[in-house]
Amino acid sequence: YLNQTEPLFDVLRVTERGFSGMVADHRNILKIVEDPSLAATNIAVQYDVTAEPQIVLTLQGPDDKALTDYLSEHRESLVQVLEKAERDRAVKFAEAFSEQRVAKAIKSTFGVDMTVPKGYVLAADEKDFLWARYEYPTASQGFFIYSYPYRGKESLSPGALLAARNEFAARIPGPSDGSYMTTSEAFEPDYRMFRMEGRLWCELRGFWDVHGDFMGGPFVSHALLDKKKGRVIVAE
């Protein structure tokens, strides 16, 4: 859900002869092996073969068509395996080098344990709203967390989630006086509800704008129902 096309991965293609040294130590590797003696196409998964952390997928098939057909049929599954490996690495790195000040603020404000990557700083911390940001020389990224009362199923509807998002996003100022973040009306956000680890979640994917200025981009938010405290917690 991006405002411009971007590849899922950066791909480096090498021959078997060139697969050595630093190339063989890449963290995500997909080997394609054509072997006419094979009766069917199969795939094997290995971890930490020449480096750590690393995932190596070896796809073997009797001919070009069999390999291509397998990739086409199982594309989504293969992408999910590689994406999970990337997420696991990111989580492991964040846990090793976390930003404790922001994590403690989240725990204090919302009672939630959250690992925050190093480099984030608190931009706002209120009783029902927290905003953390990471500044680059030419760009900025960040996340915000907020909560609002749960008053029944309607509190998790797309309309309620959007209304809450716009209310709290307005607390994030834009670059010019009087400007603030809001949800773009150019495209209706995608909404889905799902359960994970026994908890009910709602997801919104859409685009944000800055009211009163020219800025925008994609966003994804996840809302969690906290029945014990009668509230909805949203992280974006």
Positions of predicted regions on the chain:
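Secretory pathway targeting signatures of secreted, lumenal, and periplasmic proteins
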Residues: 1, 117-174, 209-211
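Solvent-exposed alpha-helical segments and adjacent loops
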Residues: 1, 33-100
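Acidic, contiguous N-terminal accessory segments
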Residues: 1-19
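N-terminal "mature-domain start" segment
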Residues: 3-4, 8, 94-123
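Signature of long, low-cysteine stretches enriched in small and polar/charged residues
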Residues: 14-66, 172-230
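Structured segments of extracytoplasmic/periplasmic soluble domains
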Residues: 81-85, 171, 207
